[in-house]
Amino acid sequence: MKSIPRRRFLKQAGQATALGCLGTRLTAASGRIALIANPAGKLIAAPSVQWALGELRQAFEAKGASCITAATPSEAGDFSLGVIVATESAALPSEGFRLAPEIIQAKPCVRASASDTRGFVYALTELADRVRHGSDPVASLALASPLVVRPANLVRSIARAFVSEVEDKSWYYDRAFWREYLTALVVNRFNRFSLTLGLGYDFPRGVTGDYLHFAYPYLVAVPRYNVRAAPLDDAERDRNLEMLRFISEETARRGMDFQLGLWTHAYEWTDSPHSDHHILGLTPQNHGAYCRDALTLLLKTCPSIQGITFRVHGESGIPEGSYDFWRTVFEGVQRAGRPVEIDMHAKGIDNKMMDVAAATGMPVKISPKYWAEHMGLGYHQAAIRELEMPQAGHEDDPIFSLSNGSRRFLRYGYGDLFQEGRRFDVLFRMWPGTQRMLLWGDPVMAAAYGRASHFCGASGVEICEPLFFKGREGTGRPQGRCGYADESLTPKSDWQKYAYTYRLWGRLLYDPQADADQWQRHLRTEFGPAAHPLEDALAHASRVLPLLTTAHQPSASNRGSWVELPANMPIAEGQPSPYSDTPTPKRFGTVSPLDPELFASIEEHAAELLQDRRGPKYSPVEVAQFFEDTTTAAEHALEDASRQATSRTDPAFRRMEEDVRIQIGLGRFYSAKLRAGVLFEIFRKTGNLEAHGQALAAYGKARAIWAAIAERARKVYVADLTYGEIPVRRGHWLDRLPAIDRDLAAVEASRFGAGPDPTDRVLRAIAQAAGHPARTSVKCTHNPPKTFQPGSAVRLGLSVHGAATEVHLHYRRVNQAERWQSLVMKGEGSAFQATIPAAYTQSPFALQYYFELRPPKAAPTLYPGFDEFFANQPYFVVEKAI
């Protein structure tokens, strides 16, 4: 057998001059497609591989091709194109695959190879995807050279939550929905699906919509316990279990792992007179044993459940430190009689809780939040907010003794989890505080996440899908999850709006270097000639909210901050703040970045400007300038797409256009408001009326932009988009205007004691706040060590190609509970040297570091810093030698 170039591949298939006729020609016997797979092979006979073969056959037949299945090429007889499913290839890693062109029996073929069933599923669904999105099936499979791919991340998971009986029952019971949705996930190389229950509320207080919240009695009747969720009847409970079994089996049928999230173990609701259900038959005495036995029954009844996710901190309804309770519950996993993963949400975790899980002998994961409860940039924050550092005085808290006290650093980050010798894997989870509803799609940022998700040996990432919390806290509405006021925009299934988002995440978490055709083919099918400019428009617009989340975030909690539709944080002094977990005094200028190591707050930057100096951190004005640039690029691309679109009234085009326009508006609003915030801080510190006037003008501009967003969105989205009960979690852009107007009036009325006539320093500060900053660029060369030996000094060198009078090394163990250290590097010409002390490296953690450069006549800057899209890791990481 030999490889075949693409041109010859097409020619031998008889398509070199008549590709357009393929659909009719392949209906003849001589135009048959042969799927050659020997069912005697153990891997090929696996149900998931057979399912994938069926998908490929359906793709061919949908294009008018005639398909035959054979065990060998000779058995296939006459065919025009063969797809050969090869036997196991040990050279390929788990979940990797190889596609290669070959000639067999003088016929063009594609050989698909893999080392496991999941690799074969990906190979075959990749071929099917090419056929579905191609103009003809043979040309779609013409490979210029062999394609070999392998996963960058071991776990690539999507989580979908049931939080509303009103909105979620329809999709939960819809078998057709599950078949299409799960197929879309595996085609895009997700390898785990997590059905999340018990997250409708963060606390068991004020509960109304409680369906499946404490999940067991909604699913199983446990012998010897007379426990039920009144008034749920037995038939509905049994139907719920039947559907859970179906969903888990359909997930496994496609070669994916099925994970069940059980986030609530409270059975009584506090101050909840209007709850829809009441759990009967449980007492403190039988609670733990019931949960254990219910979990065992659930796992035995649904053998395709391969893991359980638990929330083990106080919001589960179980006080932190209740080790005996969790030891009892985990026995339910052990009694299932097979390996079942225990995945514990990281908040409130301590070593003793880790020991309880490890003692089961089951595989254990701990899943910290990626960027608090939001979506930041595609790296891991260099530092957590000061509010998340450990705090004394909470040891006697009856519910949150750990997560509010000594283990506070695990509330919103990975904390101290990356220790050598850990008995658990780490799986990041991206929470839905930033992107809940608007369409997102930036290949550059998705690839950055693909590179960052195996940070320090992490297993990967679970993404809470769009609409994850829609209808939470009893706010479900019958008009549908997407929230469109114009019903013509509502897709058949809610996930279909986000098909492109799923494709980017799945493909680029699997392979951050994936060929762009993997997502562009989808856009070409959907949008024809407008595909390329739409890709650019959405990518540029999608860069706004992750950067905003990283650089300026008034609340780490998704309950408090909805970045797409934020409650207005006041600029003026003394106005009521809608956010509680934010620095005091609570106003726009004091808001912390989610990464305060690399980004400056408004107050911090204004102080620098007034001291006539610039710090090395990325400033709010730099962020504002990026927003201006990326939204301009998005708008131009959207205009190109509008000119090239086959139909501007097509629902898919309109959905993308409207969401892009809203994100453009958000970027421009925050660009103006960030500048207004810096100018107001200058006014607050100096009393300078020029600063006051410019702050007022910038804020007025921001207000006009917001009003335009809101007015356009009035025709697109319903007036009350519900992701929770209180105003910060629901509403519409129009609702936010009154608070903006009140704050704008307060800014106008503000007066501070004026100093003497403005100095040049103050005027320069005002000009820089309103100007167009350009970050200092210094070319450097650095070769990071591959590993280090704990207890030995780590010597680092940096070559600076240009003037730098001083270079500082900033370093820290990969432990967010610790603070960064720094030292001045010794310079000789362009070469700088520094040593991380041996005593500091003696720890169970890897090291991370970056450089601060201070040129003689320019602002300080950072190396490696960020690239032009803020889509890289801005520091170096060195792991311990094995």
Predicted regions and their residues:
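Short, well-ordered secondary-structure micro-motifs within conserved domains or adaptor modules
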Residues: 68-93
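C-terminal segment of N-terminal export signals and the immediately downstream linker at the start
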Residues: 23-37
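Glycan-association/targeting regions that enable binding to alpha-glucans and other polysaccharides
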Residues: 740-882
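Feature activates predominantly on carbohydrate-active enzymes
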Residues: 52-55, 59, 92-286, 300-304, ...
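Catalytic-core regions of glycoside hydrolase
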Residues: 61, 134-135, 191, 203-206, ...
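Short, charged N-terminal beta->alpha structural module
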Residues: 40-61
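N-terminal secretory signal peptides and thylakoid transit peptides that target proteins
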Residues: 2-17
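C-terminal non-catalytic alpha-helical accessory regions
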Residues: 137, 465-732, 736-737
